[in-house]
Structure formats: structure tokens, C-alpha cells
Design a protein with these regions (language model features):
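A metal-dependent, Asp-based hydrolase signature
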Residues: 43-93, 111
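Short helix-capping segments at alpha-helix termini
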Residues: 33-37, 76-78, 137-141, 164
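Active-site neighborhood of HAD-like aspartate-dependent phosphohydrolases
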Residues: 1-44
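Glycine-centered short loops/turns at secondary-structure junctions
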Residues: 115-116, 188
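Active-site periphery "cap/insert" segments of enzyme catalytic domains
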Residues: 95-110
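Asp-based, Mg2+/Mn2+-dependent phosphohydrolase catalytic module
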Residues: 1-3, 106, 110, 125-227
Length: 227
């Protein structure tokens, strides 16, 4: 029986978060000093990013604003202008990198596309996400593509209705328990969790090991054996 397979973009279809982690390392070195340990700096940045999450802020520009806000709470006022200028440089240096697909994506999609309906549901800044989709070379393999500001239960319900999906045969596939797995399950979809060691810390959440509507796989290529 054909299913509808919906794929996350960042760190599922293509690599993403490692660019942000490298930027965070530079930010940490930039603002370090006094009583602020590396762990405390990361916690402060996480606090700011968590608040931005709920406003739908994502992408490099939002990340830059978050670093600026965190820096304002960490460094002395006299030093702040220099630090903020350096933060802007960190964001500029992130640039527009070439899209690097995760291992096995092309061959796996080619095989799955012959049996199932494929879609992309990715969260973030629309311009950035569409640039990745267009630059990935795989957009033509998908029937449905949606860039959203929030991945919550309401979003998945909206997609089910708008795309006329059957939740019982629709699977959300991704690396984020918080964005891909839990809200999709709350909306009645099934889910495939593909862990990625580079997953953003704020995307982590506990999954119910007894939930038989979630499959955990070790790699993207393993989807072929399941579908």
C-alpha cells in the first residue's frame, strides 16, 4: 500500500546545524570572561533562542539577533559595541554554503518515489529554506513542499487537511523529536525518527519507547527496507 512520506529538511535531507555550532564556538570565545563559563554562555544563548523559537524565529538572521541579545546580557556595556560588530561578522561568515545532502538521500528518494508520495515539511526562514530546496537538486522528487514557521500539532493538522492526507498512511520523517516526531504524532500521523548527532539542542525531547507509531532508524538509507 502506498504511503505519504513527509521529510524534514535541515539535518534530515541536508546538513545544517554544524554551521551554527561552529558559529556558537566563535561566539563563546568572543564573549567569554569574568564569571561566564562556556556552559553558562551556551545556556544564556539557549534561553534567548528558546524565546525566539516561540515567536517563529529561525534561520541565520534570527540567529544573529539571538547572539546580539545574549551578548548584551553577558558583556560589559563599554565592550558591547565591539562585540556586536564581531557578532555581525560571525553571521556574515556563515555565508550561503552549498547544500550538502545527507548520505544516501538521492538513491533512497529515487527508490521510495516509485512506490510512495513524497513531501517536504521544513521549518525556518522561508527565503533560506527555499534556497536550500532549490539548491538541493532533489525538489522535483516531491509532490508536496511546505516551509513553515512553526512545526506544531496545528501545523500538521493543517497540512493533513490541505493536502488531503490520510494520517494512518502518512509518515513524518526527521531528526527532531520536538519538531518532527511529537507534534506529528499528536496530529495522528506516524513518524520515523532518524537521530543525527548534530541535531540542535533545542530540538531534543523525550520519546515514548512504547509508542508503536514511531520507528527509529540508524540511517536515511534504512527507509528503503521499511517502505
Amino acid at each position: 500500500m502506498a504511503s505519504t512520506l513527509l521529510f524534514d529538511g535541515d539535518d534530515t535531507l541536508w546538513a545544517n546545524n554544524h554551521h551554527f555550532e561552529l558559529a556558537i564556538e566563535r561566539f563563546t570565545a568572543l564573549v567569554a570572561g569574568g564569571a561566564w563559563t562556556d556552559a553558562a554562555i551556551r545556556d544564556e544563548l539557549d534561553r534567548v533562542e528558546e524565546a525566539a523559537w516561540h515567536r517563529g524565529g529561525a534561520g541565520k538572521d534570527a540567529f544573529g539577533r539571538n547572539m546580539r541579545e545574549a551578548a548584551a546580557g553577558i558583556v560589559a556595556a563599554a565592550r558591547l559595541p565591539t562585540v556586536l560588530e564581531a557578532v555581525d561578522g560571525i553571521v556574515r561568515d556563515m555565508g550561503t554554503t552549498e547544500v550538502a545532502l545527507m548520505p544516501g538521500v538521492v538513491s533512497t528518494l529515487e527508490e521510495l518515489g516509485g512506490r510512495h508520495v513524497l513531501g517536504i515539511v521544513t521549518r525556518g526562514d522561508p527565503a533560506e529554506q527555499w534556497a536550500k530546496i532549490d539548491g538541493s537538486g532533489i525538489s522535483g522528487r516531491f509532490t508536496h513542499i511546505e516551509v513553515v514557521r512553526h512545526k506544531d500539532e496545528a501545523t500538521y493538522w493543517r497540512l493533513v487537511a490541505g493536502w488531503h492526507l490520510d494520517p494512518a498512511t502518512t509518515w513524518m520523517i526527521g531528526n527532531s523529536p520536538r519538531s518532527d516526531i511529537l507534534p506529528a504524532r499528536a496530529a495522528g500521523l506516524r513518524a520515523v525518527y532518524i537521530p543525527n548527532p548534530s541535531t540542535w539542542r533545542l530540538e531534543q525531547a523525550e520519546l515514548d519507547p512504547s509508542d508503536d507509531g514511531v520507528i527509529t532508524l540508524g540511517s536515511f538509507e534504512e527507509l528503503v527496507g521499511r517502505f
